[in-house]
């Protein structure tokens, strides 16, 4: 059996995956990376080894950590994985903040909307929200719309990240102007 992340060893929404692997009689398990979640963190691997299963850990670890980057960031840094997204002209400029300017093309809009569909929340600054009135939903891709968050003077980034962590939101995409992006 090949898995990108260590099988869980605790009861949560589902029974432990490690127990299922043991009961199914699997002889060998190849694990890409260890689960950083405190309730697992090596215990799943130990459960398998205690049952006599041959376990190899760290195969394609870098690639597996990339696949699980949102989950891993959540459990190692106690905040969501953050994606900074902006559109700029070929000569490196953002829009002028006076008129909403469409810089993105159809393909980049699709890519942006895919990122939105894969993210739990989306954040823009107050100025962007007021001037551009962005929809911040998913239209050019299939998937759920992320939670909309507007950064204002009354809210700090740390408070937003703490709330998202508490709610187990694993990813945040920031689509702000220059000052919002610089805040991260």
PLM features: what roles do these ranges have?
Residues 1-5:
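A short, small-residue-rich loop immediately preceding and capping a beta-strand
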Residues 11-184:
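Zinc-dependent deaminase
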